[in-house]
Amino acid sequence: MNKSKGGLQLTVQTLSLVAGFMVWSIIAPLMPMISQDIKITSSQISIVLAIPVILGSVLRIPFGYLTNIIGAKWVFFSSFIILLFPIFLLSQAQSVNMLMLAGFFLGVGGAVFSVGVTSIPKYFPKDKVGLANGIYGMGNLGTAVSSFLAPPIAGAIGWQSTVRLYLIVMAVFAIVMFFLGDAKEPKVKIPLVAQTKDLLKDLRTYYLSFWYFITFGSFVAFGIFLPKYLVDHYELTTVDAGIRAGIFIAIATFLRPLGGIIGDKIDAVKALKVDFLFMIIGAIILGIANDMILFTVGCLTVSVCAGIGNGLVFKLVPQYFQKEAGVANGIVSMMGGLGGFFPPLVITYVTSITGTSHLAFIFLALFGVLALVTMWHLSKKNRSLAYK
């Protein structure tokens, strides 16, 4: 394997993922300002914030498959060109419908995740795949970049002009990928239908998808709802709330490679059991939190577990599904993205019914318990699957 080429592609694709996630998550940190200019209800805000997750999740399957057919270079390049249009539309938005339409197509920025996790393992030996995928996953930091930088920039030049700056980011990364992307990346041409049939027959596909639904779903959901939630429930300023949300995202992102390293060294399923146990504890803390300190402790606990858990799950995907890695990555990452779609809606609904959001966090704990049951079942049903 060409180590220098692998290092270059890991760097370029990780930075490209940063750019994609910056765009994918741009609406959430700017929503407090957007809602001042566009008349929008609380329920509509939840929908607008969740909409980018839909396309960003569903497209991960074809993006993973296309990566094996034409290579990461052209999937990334095409995605960045496409994203120019919804970014411009968002900068011109004057109604809720325009926000929804722009947000839907911004989902392309989230879909590029499955490109790298399909491409990167081709450049590294098996005992380094977990670490390599973990480093690539740090591209999730793009969400934190938007959370940290977008609110103060918008405070200075307005949210519309801030969004237009992202046009420059996309153009730059399209050029970078055009010149530095690997046109000679190894291709895997197995019919999509055949790959999908095999995966749908494998219990591990469903279990990995469920685990990632929780770990990555938590990462996405907290990144989406925290800025507005902290402003509404704890009366923080928009900038302060954005910084705190960014810290949550940054911790989860930087710990993702640690999950990959742990998965390279010990059995990843065993490590996931411990990880989910602590996530359950964090969710329970959030469910009973009545002050900012306790809420912060709960958020930080979930952040740590989400980051490590993300790395552990994507250590297992190429380990279990070598020939079907592209589609498997797409399916699992799609479910992770969808895991971020429902929580903001659930929190809004539960709060409207009960007057508090506490019960919504208890749902996260219950999902964690179900995940532990599936891990136990996987090991009991056939230990060779868990230690393959």
Swiss-Prot record:
Q: Name one GO biological process term.
A: nitrate assimilation
What are the UniProt keywords, alphabetically?
A: Cell membrane, Membrane, Nitrate assimilation, Transmembrane, Transmembrane helix, Transport
Bilayer-crossing residues are 14-34, 45-65, 69-89, 98-118, 139-159, 161-181, 206-226, 242-262, 276-296, 297-317, 330-350, 359-379
Q: Which SUPFAM superfamilies match?
A: MFS general substrate transporter
**Where found in the cell?**
Cell membrane
Record's note on what induces expression: Positively regulated by the two-component system NreB/NreC.
The record's annotation in Pfam families points to: MFS_1
A GO molecular function assigned to this protein is:
nitrate transmembrane transporter activity
The GO cellular component terms are: plasma membrane
Please report the record's description of how this protein sits within the membrane.
Multi-pass membrane protein
Record-linked PROSITE patterns: MFS
Family under the similarity heading: Belongs to the major facilitator superfamily. Nitrate/nitrite porter (TC 2.A.1.8) family.
Q: What does this protein do?
A: Probably required for nitrate uptake under anoxic conditions. Also possibly involved in excretion of nitrite produced by the dissimilatory reduction of nitrate.
PANTHER family reported for this sequence: HIGH-AFFINITY NITRATE TRANSPORTER 2.3 (PTHR23515)
Its name, as the record gives it, is Probable nitrate transporter NarT
Species source reads Staphylococcus carnosus (strain TM300)
